[in-house]
Structure formats: C-alpha cells, structure tokens
C-alpha cells in the first residue's frame, strides 16, 4: 500500500510534479535541438572503414581550395582561370572513359538572347532582354539503360565580386567533381549530365543557357547544388512535388536534412534570393534544391572563404548529394499520380517525413469538423454531470493570454526602440527572454485568479479554449491552402498542434463510461486553491479530504467546509477525473477503486499528448526559420518588423501548449523563470548587435565620373539607423580632404554617398586618371534622316568601347511615350573577313525597357542595333508634312560594371588595387563591418546618349 500511495503522490496533478515534468520536457527538447544542430560535425567518413568516401571528401576539399583562391565573378579574368581549372579537372577525371562526353560553351562560342523577367523581384514590371555569352562546362555520363531519362546535376562556378565563393557555390562545384569521379568509375543505369555553369549570381544565366542545349531534352530530374549562406549544413530547400520528396526519403538514409518551411519562404518571397532551381523547375524538370542557408552575414562577403568553413560542412552537401544521385541514377523510379507539393521535414537527421499537401488539407478539414463535435459532446456531458463553471473561470485564460500578449508587444516595441538589430547578433537570447516573461505573466495572472476564485476546472477550460484558438488558426490556414493550390508547405506545425489537442480532448471524453459524479440536484463541487495539493503529498487512507463544497441557491452561494470520508482509498473528487468514467460516486457515496487511474494519470496523459510533441515541433520550426532569416534585419527596418512579428507569434505558439497547466507551476520554478527572463531580456537591450563573428553587412558601389575621376562617388547601402556615417567620416581619405558625407533614407534603408579614392580600372602609363574609360559611338541613326518615311520604324547602330569589361546594361527612355518605343534589339558581331553581321536578334511587341549584355571578350566593343517606333499622334487629321513629325527622340543610359575585390592594375609600372576606395573601407572600418557588392560590379561607369 505504501508503494501505491507513493505512485499516487508522484503522478498527482501537484505543483512539484508538474514543475519537474515541465523542466525535464524542455531539457530534453533543448538537448535534442543542440544535438541536431551540431551532429553534422561528428559525421565525417572514417579514413579506414570508409576509405572511398573519405577520398572523395579529401579531393573535394582540395578542389575547393583551388577554386576559392580569389574572387571570380563572371566579369573578371579570374573567372576564366576557374573555368580552365574545372575543364582540366573534368578531362583528367574522364580521360579513360569512352562513355563520357564534354561540351564547352566557351570553345563553342555559345550565346543566347532572350526576354527575361526580373528573377530576383517578381513584382518588377521592367521589360528586360538579356544577351549572354556562355562558358558552361557540360559533361554527359552515358548510362547503361538508354530508356531511362537522364539526371542533371548543376552548380555554378562564378562568385560575386566581393566573395571567394567557398560556399556560394564552390562547395557545390567541388561536390559535382566528386560525383563525376564516382560515376566515371561506376557507370550508372541512367545517364547523368553535369552542368558546371557560369554567371548565376546576376540572373541565373548559366542555367538559362543550358535550357538551349540539346542534351536538356534527355533530362527528367535535376539536383541543384547551391550556397545561400556561408557554411554550416546543407539543407533540402525545396523539391518539386510529393514524388521527388519520396525519392529523397528513400535515397538519403544517412543524415537527411530538409524542411518545407524553407520552400514556403521561397514561394511567399520572404527569401529574396533565387537559385538555378527556378530555371529548371519552370522548364518542366523535377528536382531538388540542396543548399547552405546560413550565416547570411558572411554570404557574398570576403568571409565566404575556406577560412570560415570546414570539411564537415562540405561533407553535409556531398553526403546527401551522393546518396541521392546514386539512388536516382540506378533505380527505375516509380512515378506517382499526384503532382501536389509536399510537406517534408526531418526528425533529428534520423527520419524523413513526407506528406502530400492535399492529404494534409483533408486532415485539416477532418480536424476542423471533429474538433467542434468533441467540444459539443464535452459541453453536453458537463451539463449531465451538473458541472457549472463561473464566467470568471471561463474568462481566466482569455484574460491572462490577452494581457500577456499586450505585455509581449510592449516588450518587443521597447526592444526595437533600444536595440533593433540585436536579432542579427543573437535571436535566441531575446526569444528565450520574451518567452519566459510571457509565461511568467500568464502564471501571475492565473495564480492571482486562483487565489481569488479557487477552482480545479481551469485545466479543462483552458484546453478547450486553446483548442478553439488553434481551430481558428487552422481554419485560416486551410482556407489559404485551398486558395494557394496547396502550395502552403510550412504550416504543418499548426496541424500537428491541433491534432495533439484533439487527442487530449478525446482521451477526456472516451477514456471510460459516462456516469454522474454527484447525483445531488443543482449542485457543484469545487476545490479551494490548488495549493492544497502541496499540503498533503501522501494522502492517508485513514484521513478524509477537505472539500470546499459550494451549492448554488438562487443568487446566493453558500460555502461549507466538510470533512467527508468518501472511501478509505479515495482522494478528492475533482475536475481531474475524466468526463466519461466507470468510477463514480453512487447513492452510497462510494467510489470504485479504478478511479485512481483517471484521478492520478489523466492530467499527465493530456500533458504528454500536448506539450512535448507540440513544443518540439514549434521550437524546431521557429529556430529553423529564424536561423535562416534573422540576419535580414541588416537589410531594412521593414525586415526588423518582420523578424519581430515572427518572434512574437513564435513566443505565443511556444507558450500555448503549457498554458492549461501553468497554474500548477510551483513558486520556486516561477521565480527562477522570471529571473532568467528578466536577465535575458535585459541582456538583449544592451547587447552589441554587431561583432567580428556577427558583422554588419554593407553594400558598396562606386560610380565613376568620366569628366573628373577624382569625383567618383562611393555609395554605401545598409539599413536605416546603422552607424555607417560615423565609420565613413573616420576613413583617412575622407578626413584628409574634409569630404562631405550625404546620407539619404528611403523606406527602411539608408544610402550614404561621398567622394572616394579614384579607381585604377585599367593598366596605364602617365596620367593615372584613366580618362575615356567609356566611349559610345553612334554608327547609324535613322532619326537624323530627313528622307525617312514618318511612318517607318527608326533604327540605330551603336558601339560601346569599354576596356577590361564584360558586362553592360542599356536603359531606354522616351519623353513622348510611357511605354518604351524600342521593339527590336540585335547583337552585331565581327566576322573573320572584318565584316559585321547580326548574330542574335529579338523582337518584343510590348517594348524593351532594359538590355543586359554579357560578353566573354574583355576588350571587344559592345556592338548592337535597335529599332523603335515613331511617335504618331492618334489623330485622323494628322499630316506629317503639314504638322511635322512627332518627337521620336529616345535616351539611352549606358552602365558598364567592372571590378572585383583583391584585383590589381599596373599604373606607371606599379601594381595598385583596382578599387582603392573599396580597399579603404575594408581596411579602416571596425572589425564588425563586412562588405559586399551592391550591383553587378563594385564599380559602374555611366553615360547617356540621345538619339
């Protein structure tokens, strides 16, 4: 009997029991989170037992070291160095294999001219045409079964001008070389095609170029390898549908890592970047986007280098890609009839879960229907049991939750006022502090209400009301799911939470049969404060229990303390018993001994149904989301608001599972929680938002003044309220020349302009001012032809000469037309016999606003022609002879981009940095700054012409 009494004491709904269980639950969840985030560091293949994979990793690491020796954007000569290295590596790997074919776009002089919407801004209405000369290296490993469609593996070898490209996308390229090495020695059943593509960074152009290659017609599946962070683990960002998600699940048995929350981030455009996955997906291929996703403040900066990454990080991509590629290339894949998007996530890298979004939609509808039915049944049974709960009890959770939300909003607002960029340095500290304070306020309000109006029914009422809140959220999500054609793949945590609540409600209803607890008419039994549980930890068989029995008589409430002996083994009769029970008090006043189960275990079963699973899913999902995007606060203050909204919603969702039980939190635990919450929130208020390991990323662009190169303006872009102006005034060149710094705020961003050190863009002797960097020649202009018919299209032929340049843009503007009058653009190339001919031409009836030109020749001119329509007034009486011709003039703004970090020019025999202004901000700014490019190059040369 002593053992039985001990068990009852352990599992009673007591403050100590609940507090211990809550602490254990969160300790386990946090330990699992730490384990999940750091486990990849322990996963390197063993050099003895797994020699083959270890050799692949070591070779990939060596390749990565070579690729990342210097920045290598498409516009640089180092880009050609990387291209040549890759081509030679591919030849060395495949030299002894007759089933492998290599195609080099550089050698083939492949080029494309096409109309392209803005891939990074889906809301842009700019009509853009792109001319691109490709240097992709394409390799085909012919499979043994020609009937199987091919697999494409793609990655890009260019970097941005400010980055060494270790993660973006050197690891992807090194992984591809290792995969090619594997398939060259082990012929796959399915042909595998590798696209080592160029110029992904500024338009996904290497992938677009591949869509014009004849081999793409053989492909059905693709794996895109990308880096949108600068290290850590590679994640399955997105995949085409349920079929491809299931393939990943079957293929990647060792350390799967993916979450469809990232996929929804792309679909909803919360993630502004894009990858080549977009191109292949729009072409109609089915595939996987495997990418690194953090840290974003190293992304596209000099810290995206070998120094700041690791073999463990490289292996996380190589391991997933190798498993997936081997499985796809050697299996006859079974196609599913469903092409719906998939909800997917891994569990600690041990299991991978895949759910059809339409199936999740049906499950949500089922829960939306079943939930209210359960609540109505519960209300009916409460009525039969004559349980009458006062309105104060009904309002208790709503009051505590409402006041806590107001308090939470005040805290986040104060944090934004005092330290808005703290989330960039550490989002977990403010998140934890806000969560603990939110729980503390709920605890205080509920405890105070318990003292004023004691009740044992709070848990049940709170579960019901939280389910109603979850039901409303689920209804909103389900309606959005239907409108979005089932593309909402990141809302599954709410579905899991609702499912947990329904299970908890069902246990209360269907655990046992229904009997009235008290047959006395118009009576209800209520306990005094729940603190009484602490007073009698081990109830005696010889002792009755003190019951605060309340009877309603008209409008009067009569209370009497009665020492009632229900049974020698019985304890309180209270709301902790299930609603449907075999264990009841009959007319004899006796209770069945089986009531002990419902009395002592009901709350703990409900706790285990709701809290661990929901808290685990909410915490992991929230941490993944914030881990990926918390650095966005550096972009604009609008992103600060977005992060705050996510944290606020996340805190509420994290707290909801424990609120029904919060009244049983003991005093000691509540004090500790409050103290830790205050300390963490206080730390968040004073924490330095930027540091060497969590730097502020600033975007750089220098605009050359051709008339006076010493007046070349430097523009630094960052979020509003960052201390960028003070840093600029501390630069040696600014101080020595007393240069003015002009900062302008637009939206949530800030741009600061000043005259920086002049660039050294080309090798030169004598005057180092680099005059005539750009020369625009108009070779032909019909607008000046007086014999031209006023109704005939106008045309012009133009040549732009820019030394050491590959990339230019043209913007067309006409004062007389809202829409661009330019309808045709043609690229003109020189032939071997010194004659010119049109190599590519495109017409676009809606008008061309902008043309981007990418050529591989550094010193050749940008030579092109355009056609535009004359301005003809919409007047039937219009006569061009009498009234004269309309305004047919157009303005062309030419911008040519050049320059990459660490590059040199020889001026008067001395090697000098090409962009000393950039070198200056890197060298003399505090160590918690890091810099990246604002545009296609670090330097832009601009000019205008009128036609």
From Swiss-Prot:
It comes from the Eukaryota. It is found in: Vacuole membrane. Residues 522-531, 546-567 have a biased composition (Polar residues). Residues 522-573 are annotated as: Disordered. The keyword Zinc applies. Residues 1-15, 380-391, 450-458, 511-601, 663-669 are cytoplasmic. Belongs to the peptidase M28 family. This is Vacuolar membrane protease.
